[in-house]
Amino acid sequence: LPENSARIDSGVVEFEGENLLDKPSEELSDKIRGRAITFIPQDPFSSFNPVFTIGTQIMELMKWKSPARDDPYYANSASRFWNGYPSTRYEADKGRVLELLREVQLPEPEAILAKYPHEVSGGQRQRLMIAMALLPEPKMIIADEPTTALDVTIQAQILHLLRTLARERDVAVLFTTHDLGTTYEICDRVTVMYAGQEMETAPSDGFFNTPSHPYTRDLLQSLPSREHGIKGIPGDIPALISPPGGCRFHPRCTAASERCSVERPDHTQISERHNVRCFHPVAHKSVGAAS
């Protein structure tokens, strides 16, 4: 990958009251990435190595990211895969892996560990990704459109599983999606982005029922309905290599003024936990929920 392909010009990335941008890379790798914060990818198939069994790969993760990593065995072991484990360590760690696979509702978990990634279904691979994200006992999981490649029935099962596990384990989930139906099903709080800028942040009910940014309103009205059919948003998404100034939605916004093209709005509080970045927020009105 090319180095220095992007930079952070301003702002903070705050986690548990600390700015992660101030952390040394060693601390980020050892304590944050893959431990306190884990990740569920969009495509689980490409995230597995096809030449190793599922069990081998999960056990490798157990070695490097387990909460017990400070154990002298993990710190000093030169072994890479299962055949280097002392029998007592192997049994304890394998038992924890099997427990996790049962928790994500995978049938016959012992048999699954012996399989290769191509030998299980897409839904099972995504459940394995969820189990691997849970293994370090994280405080936050970033889920990157984890249901995109799944059929509707499996999508519903995965969403229900994520919701249940997050509640039971008290884990925050940052869920990235372009699917408004999925947003309605799983999210407690929603941030709407357009061309890399935050437009509006609101509780889920406020997002669907009282949208305050013109883009949020237009986005919801673009959902097909019996009342207005399919209503698109005029114009095109800007090229991010040279985005428009001010609010990036202003070239397509029916409420835009000259000020919108030169100045980016600050946050305006609409209600508790609901704010919008717009000089001309729309009146509150219900537009219905996604279906």
Positions of predicted regions on the chain:
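A short, proline-enriched helix->beta-strand linker immediately N-terminal to the Walker B motif
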Residues: 135-139
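Conserved ABC ATPase "signature" region
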Residues: 19, 73-111, 220
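Conserved ABC transporter NBD signature motif
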Residues: 8-19, 75
